[in-house]
């Protein structure tokens, strides 16, 4: 019994506020708050910017097909026949879906420094090749290969950051890099408007013009940055090149004390089961699924929706920029507040209501100016949801292996929302797209109720654990087995 009490006392989490002037580690290592703040500042400058840039390129190469569509792609490759364009979008997410979990397991084994840039170079090269496609079938193949490389990017980057940051620090950082998705929408609209104007160039049958310029130059930029990324990207806190020896020890120990797990543990089937059987992960995955219907749908179809407001192609590209900029700033602000207040579900519920208002206006209002205002509501309301659900799942997963599987698992199920999104706005439903707006409105209502459920579930579990109703899980376990309980440990507390 004494051993059990000792182990439990060592495990207590205190929700991310453990290691300020700590001296109870195994090796007696202690540090001050000032040292930890300085360390976190260094990590911020060396990890967050590179991940943000890489994810911006990832999302840019994913959604540029929406910009290319109104610059002649659909007409030249006969994508307006039936639902061909929707199949081109779907094939990407179908492949993407099956890549995420295996990719994160590989990442855990080989490390992120070269693996993540490898993925970036891969999808950048595929984007360049898309510029030379001359048929519907060729475009399908290109999008499938894009899914192979992009599938591991988002969950991989989330796991990478979780290896450097404590639970209470994570959402703000994930919020910054995932906000690159909305910035890619803004940046993509500006780039597309400019690149499409470049005069035709190339040789023989490999002529590049209009929509082909979009794929070629955006892909080329991605490849160049991907090749340079390993110079800047660290592998893990224990070997980070920008930290001195003491800082490396602090960076490693502060995470070990919070999660009470072995940082170098190998992924096993037990970790996979623990991640996939967690009720909270199901909640976050379903929420991510519903959010993705909106975010992925808007990212690809916004130029088309705006073009149906009677804007010409160039104006439609440019008018998509301001809503994305607002969404980006909003996502970062909410991520910051969420980390400061250690609340996740509350902000998800509030912003779901904002998105609901926007989709209600788009569904039932006629005036184009009012509907354009509604675009701001839906982007600001929906875009913060993805990083919030992902961070919420990672926050409530203990141990690097479980976090790796959890992040990939949540994004994998969420990717099904991306598949659904490709069928929400079909050509026959335009120009008002009532069915697409109705589906998204229903999805945001679902997000609201899932956020409320997640809060109540976490509060209930924390209350039961505080009352000793989960202490039976420690019976018959030695210290090492107790450390591997993860989120099931009686002293683990969920972030709400």
Regions found by a protein language model. Give the residues of each.
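Structural signature of the two symmetry-related core transmembrane helices
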Residues: 114-128, 346-361
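Extracellular/lumenal inter-transmembrane loop segments of multi-pass membrane transporters
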Residues: 70-85, 110, 128-140, 148, ...
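Conserved MFS/SLC helix-loop-helix module at the cytosolic interface between two early adjacent transmembrane helices
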Residues: 97-137
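Helix-to-loop junctions at the C-terminal end of transmembrane segments
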Residues: 98-111, 329-343
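Extracytoplasmic gate region of multi-pass secondary transporters
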Residues: 66-67, 270-335, 390, 422
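Extracytoplasmic
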Residues: 46-82, 99, 103, 188-192, ...
